[in-house]
Amino acid sequence: MTDSEKSATIKVTDASFATDVLSSNKPVLVDFWATWCGPCKMVAPVLEEIATERATDLTVAKLDVDTNPETARNFQVVSIPTLILFKDGQPVKRIVGAKGKAALLRELSDVVPNLN
């Protein structure tokens, strides 16, 4: 991605997690990932699509577990990619492993209406 391209996802860190995720008015899907993780790279474009298409219903955030180990540890993330959906500051759904767009939307739709 070049500097001129704007990502639809937001980058969160250990320092910004409480503000960007836990205090959000919208549900936030956090992608716990790492630069060296092949499956993480496969799911990244799917998450960008969801972030763009469902921006009114959902925020998609990315947290690099190598540079932000505290948050990953706090939520017991042991495998990546792990996606955790937060609603009203609480984790309400955990999805481990790379999944396609339709499967992700289906899994999230029971918590976030309007995703199907």
UniProtKB/Swiss-Prot annotation:
One Pfam family hit: Thioredoxin
Top-rank taxon: Bacteria
Disulfide bonds: C37-C40
Gene Ontology CC: cytoplasm; cytosol; extracellular region; peptidoglycan-based cell wall; plasma membrane
Keywords from the named record: Disulfide bond, Electron transport, Redox-active center, Transport
Keyword check for Electron transport: yes
Presence of the UniProt keyword Transport in the record: yes
Lineage: Bacteria, Bacillati, Actinomycetota, Actinomycetes, Mycobacteriales
GO biological process, one term: cell redox homeostasis
Role summary: Participates in various redox reactions through the reversible oxidation of its active center dithiol to a disulfide and catalyzes dithiol-disulfide exchange reactions.
Signal peptide, first to last residue: none
SUPFAM superfamilies: Thioredoxin-like
Name of this chain's protein: Thioredoxin
Residues of the Thioredoxin domain: 2-113
Example of a GO MF term: disulfide oxidoreductase activity
Membership in a protein family: Belongs to the thioredoxin family.
